[in-house]
């Protein structure tokens, strides 16, 4: 957990001044934005689409709801949510990175999804929305890049309606030692090489692999959600714990 007085924080395996992390992460995503979707498909063999589909199925979102998709990037979840909430509902795709927002906005416009979706550049630690606004909040593969994760979770709790739920889809800790070893080899050898080949950027993908290892494990993240007020918190391991879906409610 981050402390307001802490002067340094992790950036992958490096320690950098806390006030520099937002800029450093922004540079990574400015670099990868244009190739983000194709790299996701290549890196996961397309499995990320199944993880996201499962997240949607656990959201409870229905017609007329108001949904916040934090770190929504290129809009994979927003596309699905826009269809679920219909013309009477709204989805806000929020991302701190304007390059990712532009890719997401263009992608959705090309699919004709414009009426019930709004794009907002926002920091998850200080969400610019009133209290008790959203029926559901999701953050998929974004929380590990946030500097102060507890502050971000508290901000999400504040803007969630009573009765609403938060879903956090994120890389986590594999359940078996063998899977962990195989995953390490893939992450630190193959992933940067793919980044270099496809996006001409090995360093950004090396950071993404390192950031996964620095992210809190399943039980730690569940505890962090409990601490800021979420109730009935739980998590489900997907693909052997390579990814976990955390769920929490506000009552």
Swiss-Prot record:
Gene3D superfamilies membership: Vaccinia Virus protein VP39
Binding site for S-adenosyl-L-methionine: 74, 95, 123-124
UniProt pathway annotation: Quinol/quinone metabolism; menaquinone biosynthesis; menaquinol from 1,4-dihydroxy-2-naphthoate: step 2/2; Cofactor biosynthesis; ubiquinone biosynthesis
Enzyme kind, highest EC tier: transferase
Catalytic activity, reaction form: a 2-demethylmenaquinol + S-adenosyl-L-methionine = a menaquinol + S-adenosyl-L-homocysteine + H(+); a 2-methoxy-6-(all-trans-polyprenyl)benzene-1,4-diol + S-adenosyl-L-methionine = a 5-methoxy-2-methyl-3-(all-trans-polyprenyl)benzene-1,4-diol + S-adenosyl-L-homocysteine + H(+)
Keywords, alphabetical: Menaquinone biosynthesis, Methyltransferase, S-adenosyl-L-methionine, Transferase, Ubiquinone biosynthesis
Record function comment: Methyltransferase required for the conversion of demethylmenaquinol (DMKH2) to menaquinol (MKH2) and the conversion of 2-polyprenyl-6-methoxy-1,4-benzoquinol (DDMQH2) to 2-polyprenyl-3-methyl-6-methoxy-1,4-benzoquinol (DMQH2).
Matching NCBIfam families: MenG_MenH_UbiE (TIGR01934), PRK00216.1-1 (NF001240), PRK00216.1-3 (NF001242), PRK00216.1-5 (NF001244)
Protein name: Ubiquinone/menaquinone biosynthesis C-methyltransferase UbiE
Species the sequence originates in: Marinomonas sp. (strain MWYL1)
Classification lineage: Bacteria, Pseudomonadati, Pseudomonadota, Gammaproteobacteria, Oceanospirillales
Gene designation per UniProt: ubiE
